[in-house]
Amino acid sequence: MTDVDIKIENIVASASIGKDIVLTEVSEALEGVNFNREQFPGLVFKLKDPKTAALIFSSGKLVCTGAKSIDDSKLAIKKTVDLMRTIDTEIPHEFEIKIQNIVASANLESTLNLEAVALELEDTEYEPEQFPGLVYRLSDPKVVLLLFGSGKVVCTGAKTRSDAKLGVERAYDRLSELDLI
């Protein structure tokens, strides 16, 4: 199998603290919070380190986006919950953090004829009038790759870094087998 370098661009993680949150209290107590109930049902809290944004909902669910590593994603959620705990001391200390999506990019170091790829490769969608990339859906690992004529690839839907890397490498190998790269 070919070794392709991937770069994590974004990680989306979520957690549920198992307790309802009074959003107005949080928005008044924390700096860096945007809250407009008419526009969006949750708070948007921007953290500087790690540079992320957390969406906080009244149900106690949090969604963190913008992290470039799984560790930073988890750290951002923990920091956000710790800050919320200064407002509401009954927020539990134990909660599960789940990685929902990893977006990664890679460069196949070769241009691609996307029309030929669409004809030869199964599980693809290519409508250049709608979107310049070819959508390639893999089942193992369960990821979606966006392939561009430049040879750039975006992988989405991965739950682990290794799944993102494996998805890109399997696509590279399949393209090589078909003499498309």
UniProtKB/Swiss-Prot annotation:
Gene3D superfamilies: TATA-Binding Protein
One GO-annotated biological process of the protein: DNA-templated transcription initiation
Organism superkingdom: Archaea
Repeat positions for Sequence: 8-84, 99-175
Any one GO MF annotation of this record: DNA binding
InterPro entries for this protein: TBP, TBP_archaea, TBP_CS, TBP_dom_sf
Keyword Iron (UniProt): no
Keywords: DNA-binding, Repeat, Transcription, Transcription regulation
PANTHER family xref list: TATA-BOX BINDING PROTEIN
Described function: General factor that plays a role in the activation of archaeal genes transcribed by RNA polymerase. Binds specifically to the TATA box promoter element which lies close to the position of transcription initiation.
Protein name: TATA-box-binding protein
Originating species: Methanobrevibacter smithii (strain ATCC 35061 / DSM 861 / OCM 144 / PS)
